[in-house]
Amino acid sequence: MTLVQHAPRFSVEEAAAIARDCFGFAVGSEGGPSPLPSERDQNFLLRDGQGRQAVLKIANALEEYALLEAQNGALQHVASHAGAALCPQPLTARDGSTIGAVTGADGRKHWVRLLSYIDGKPLALVKPHDAGLLAELGGFMGRLDGALAGYDHPALRRTFHWDLAQAANVIGQYKDEIADPQRRALIERLFGHFEQATLPGLGGLRHGVIHGDANDYNVLVRDRQVSGILDFGDMVYSIVAADVAIAAAYALLDKPLPLGAVADVVRGYHDAYPLGEDEVARAEKDLDKSTHT
């Protein structure tokens, strides 16, 4: 059974009842709930009678409690070190916890949380992505990683396919399944470069808990400033510099000068949370090598 097959299937009426019964959040007559996009979970935007907004998150039936606990802990850690504006905050349930439990019509148990709402438009829908906005993105990720420094949780030290530090295992396992010979040859060539030039130096780089998924639909923007980031489901204890690498990888897409976009993001990150000499040297070496691969 896949994660999608275990996704929750609650109606908007049931979501309103969960918010009320578990968290004491009474949805107003004109406040939704409004379903939000999600493949494996179920999210609803709520508004109460006073206009206050929150997001109800009903987890996949396969989601581990410990991972949600780790996410909530990270959100609270960030708030205590950099203020609550960077990311949503878990709201307290009637029983004093921040994670409740509900049972679906199929009998499966789902963990449920209520998070504060952050206003903003997804970066993907904000144009143009000029140097200032990309540097702002990098700066935001730097502030986030700085706020996450010192946070840890056993559940985040996990085997996870989207962790860049574990990329060699994932690519090595699946590259032979690429049907197109040309694509497979390209991946094998790049993978060979990665194994020889990059992998040996990763272990010595700075490690810590990272967000891990700064894609342009998770990053929110308001008035040309990054207002927050969503979806901490890919959090993992990994290479800290992977966070800015992921943000830069999304930022370069469809850009006429992709390396310029990367430079803008990295510059903003470095100004907010300086990269170490070893991290900069590794990036320079990989970039120089990749241009000749």
Model features per residue range: what roles?
Residues G96, R108, V112-V126, N169-E177, ...:
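A glycine-centered beta->alpha junction motif in the catalytic cores
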Residues S11-A26, G150-H153, A168-G212, P274:
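An alpha-helical support segment within catalytic cores of ATP-dependent transferases
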Residues A241-P274, D288-T293:
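Active-site activation/catalytic loop segments of kinase-like enzymes and analogous catalytic loops
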Residues R94, L125-A185, L205-H207:
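A cross-family kinase active-site recognition segment
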Residues I58-K109, V126, A131-A135:
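A conserved alpha-helical element in kinase catalytic cores
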Residues E39-G49, V55-L56, P90, E195-A242:
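Active-site acidic catalytic loop and adjacent metal/ATP-binding pocket
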Residues F25-R47:
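ATP-binding glycine-rich phosphate-binding loop
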Residues G132, L275-L287:
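All-alpha amphipathic helical-bundle segments outside canonical DNA-binding/catalytic cores
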